[in-house]
Structure formats: C-alpha cells, structure tokens
Amino acid sequence: MARIAGINIPDHKHTVIALTAIYGIGKTRAQAICAATGIAEDVKISELSEEQIDKLRDEVGKFTVEGDLRREVTLNIKRLLDLGCYRGLRHRRGLPVRGQRTKTNARTRKGPRKPIKK
C-alpha cells in the first residue's frame, strides 16, 4: 500500500478514486493532481512506480489536507463561536447555519424529536 499524506492509499483502485481517500481531496482535485503529475487517471495505484508515487506525494503536499485541514475547519468554527455572530450562535445551538428552514425539517442537525411534556 502506498502512503500519501499519512494515509494508506488503496492499491486496487484507480489513481483518481484512490486519492479521494485523503481528507480534503475530492474527485476534481484528484483529477487535477493526476494531470499535473502526468499520471493517467485509469492506472491503478499498484501499477505505479515509486517515482510516480513520489510525484503524487509532492503534488498532494501543496494542498492543505488531513489533520491540518480538519484543524483549520475546527478553528474557523471556534472563531465564529467566539465572535458571537449569527453563524456562531447557530453552531452553538446545533441548528442549520446556512439559512435552511427549521419549522419542519433540519432533523439531521437538530437530532431526534423530543416529545412535548403535557
């Protein structure tokens, strides 16, 4: 198994799909990485040479991925909470942040229904 950005990349998958196993790399960014390194998207990771894997490591290293990205997202949310702005309050209360309706939906964010005691 190849190890890129501290993650074991699955060998049996195509390069584009295997790169999406890294947090912060989706399909579009994986395609861009393959284009920049000159590696075909339909080649499996097990078929790549060590030199090609090193190229992938270097290209992935240019992006904020995995732990650094998770930390950045957490700090951004914490900053909103500290500011006390509307988005921070919505995060604090566990409600949708981006203007979705909450009268009938938003069950994922709000959690299971709580019965009203009479």
UniProtKB/Swiss-Prot annotation:
Domain of life: Bacteria
SUPFAM superfamilies the record matches: S13-like H2TH domain
A single cellular component GO annotation: cytosol
Disulfide bonds: none
Record PROSITE patterns: RIBOSOMAL_S13_1, RIBOSOMAL_S13_2
Coiled-coil ranges per UniProt: none
Keywords in alphabetical order: Ribonucleoprotein, Ribosomal protein, RNA-binding, rRNA-binding, tRNA-binding
Chain spans, region Disordered: 94-118
Signal peptide: none
One example GO MF annotation: tRNA binding
GO biological process: translation
Pfam families: Ribosomal_S13 (PF00416)
Function according to Swiss-Prot or TrEMBL: Located at the top of the head of the 30S subunit, it contacts several helices of the 16S rRNA. In the 70S ribosome it contacts the 23S rRNA (bridge B1a) and protein L5 of the 50S subunit (bridge B1b), connecting the 2 subunits; these bridges are implicated in subunit movement. Contacts the tRNAs in the A and P-sites.
Binding partners and assembly: Part of the 30S ribosomal subunit. Forms a loose heterodimer with protein S19. Forms two bridges to the 50S subunit in the 70S ribosome.
Family of the protein in this entry: Belongs to the universal ribosomal protein uS13 family.
Protein name: Small ribosomal subunit protein uS13
Organism: Pasteurella multocida (strain Pm70)
Name of the coding gene: rpsM
